Amino acid sequence: MANILITGASSGVGAELARRLATRGDSLFLSGRSEDKLKNLGLNASIFAGDLTSPGAAEKLVASAISELGSLDVVIHCAGIGLIKPAADTTDAEFTHVMNVNTRAAFLLARESCKVMAAAKKGLFITIPGILGKAPMRNASAYVASKYALTGMIKCFAQEYQRSGLRFCLFHLGGIDTPFWDQIQMAVQRDKMIPVATAADLILQAIDAPPHLVLSEVVMQPESHQLV
């Protein structure tokens, strides 16, 4: 059993992972913006409702997780937002917001949690830049920028914590059939997307890998978009 912190745990991949990990007996600390949604998961887990972009939120989240769990073995960062919009129509405020949520919040969480895990000389940090963390897409420049930055940032963390016992895993997954798409003004074929259960299966493989091995970067795409 492991002590695991999951952000973005109230829906989508984060919620699916929380349910799977709780079933097998791992100790969980779940974070999301909606306390009600976290409680409605009905899991035996500690919860933290808040906005990771708020001052001091990441520090408080990690400290609370340590207080409840005693230690951290795995951090799974699933929180994020989307923005599909032509560059010419993207406002300064929209660009700043998507970078704050998708990149800055991830940096703050990684900074605080990696300090703790490095002190214990073990730990796994998983995040999901998605396929747009390594491939461009029209009408998504701000979103792609936030995900490319996330990819590069975590690779820097991996270098800085080399030989410290920490492992880092990036999941470059294509479109996953989650509520994320409910808020996106874009025609998509939900039935062609990666099922949430399949994405969770893949991430569980990274968690269960032997401690001397790491799935550094994992790419999974729908067949129609392979080799992007």
Regions found by a protein language model. Give the residues of each.
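Residue(s) in the substrate-gating loop at a strand-loop-helix junction
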Residues: G130
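Conserved glycine-rich cofactor-binding loop
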Residues: S10-S11
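Conserved glycine-rich Rossmann-like NAD(P)H-binding loop of the short-chain dehydrogenase/reductase
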Residues: R24-L38
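Active-site helix of classical SDR
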Residues: A110, S146
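C-terminal helical subdomain
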Residues: R163-L166, L170-F171, V188-V228
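The beta1-alpha1 cofactor-binding region of Rossmann-like NAD(H)/NADP(H)-dependent oxidoreductases
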Residues: G50-L61, D92
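Substrate-binding pocket helix/loop in short-chain dehydrogenase/reductase
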Residues: P86-A87, E94-T96
